[in-house]
Amino acid sequence: MVPMNRNHSANDIIDDMTTTDNTNTERKPVIHNAGIGLMGWTYMHLVKPYVFHTEPDKLHEQMVSFCKVAEKIPGLMGLLHLFTEVESGSLERDIMGLHFMNPFGLSAGLDKTGNLTTCLDSAGWGFETVGTMTGTYSKGNPRPWYHRLPEQTALMVHAGLPSEGAEIVAKRASSAKRKHGMLLFGSVGPSNKQYENQLDGMIDDYLKAFDVINTDVGFNGIEINISCPNLQFGEPFTDAHNVNTLMDEIAKRQINKPVMVKCPSFMNANELIPILDVLAAHAFINGVSVCNLRRDRTGLQIPDDWLGNISGLPTQECNENAIKLVRKNYDDRFVINGIGGTITPDDALRKLDEGADLVSGITAFMYRGPQMMAEWKRALIHREQK
């Protein structure tokens, strides 16, 4: 029994219940398994029907608003942690000089405003990538930003890097409470607007955002997003020469933390090699996130008037080919964050087997529910115990 202390908050009391001691070591797995199962059942049978009958743009706004309120309710974050945390030393990783509680994280794109950090930390995520954040305010594309493709376990995305600006978003995310060791990365990119000189203007915006995250002690790492297929005024950083120009400018900085680069998705993974060669030549780059949204609609039933690119299961094959290509051609030069089409626990484990050091997801959050992270971790523990 946890003694009541008038100086303890409700969150503190529940956190005390989750610490390892002789009285609760055997009880914790039972609580966690029951909590994960209950959350999964509740999501699939009660929440998901509402999710799939709500306009996706509106649903995203409601989710952010819910998380902002939920983290302020006494005891709720502690209860979330109690139900979902799956603890094991076998999950922990030391990568890029950082200690990850587990190798699974949230990709950039869902938490554009930095409002989900406390909830994700409480739910046991290993890391979160906030953003993408732009150097200056970026309105993004005209609505709608999202369309669901349930038959294909996918989502059409046409947001176009909306951002309040890196200074505002970074301050919000880095000041959020993180009591359970989740690491925080900041994704940086260019504002979605036309410049007098498009390449120079975009690079300048990258640098503004980079400088904010680089100097913010609340962030553990930086992800440079060179894959922005929904920008209205072109995507120059699918060209290796332009990537080199951008990286040369960033290399002039005094870089204070690990740097990843989020790469574009190609149906033929070999098209990545010129970009990877450029990245490999810049010593400050620690790793790559492969890969972003799929552009090619071949074989997919998508209305012609739906703008955007594809997230979810249809990205799986080409992005996993990219993971294998990076590991085969560059050995241990890059830390690999595998993203794209990671829906089930088996998908997450397969990416690790193919050479990824870290695995991120977004679309599974909608199709599987918020307990997905606990399911991934539990699957990894079970496999390593065999």
Regions found by a protein language model. Name each.
Residues 108-111, 187-191, 263-269, 335-346:
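Glycine-rich beta-to-alpha transition loops that act as phosphate-gripper elements at the mouths
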Residues 115-120, 267-280, 342-359:
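Catalytic cores of alpha/beta
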Residues 129-136, 287-294, 342, 348-375:
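Glycine-rich phosphate-binding active-site loops on the catalytic face of alpha/beta enzymes
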Residues 131-182:
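A gly/proline- and charged-residue-enriched helix-loop-helix capping module
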Residues 140-153, 298-312, 364-386:
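C-terminal helical cap(s) of enzyme catalytic domains, especially alpha/beta-barrels
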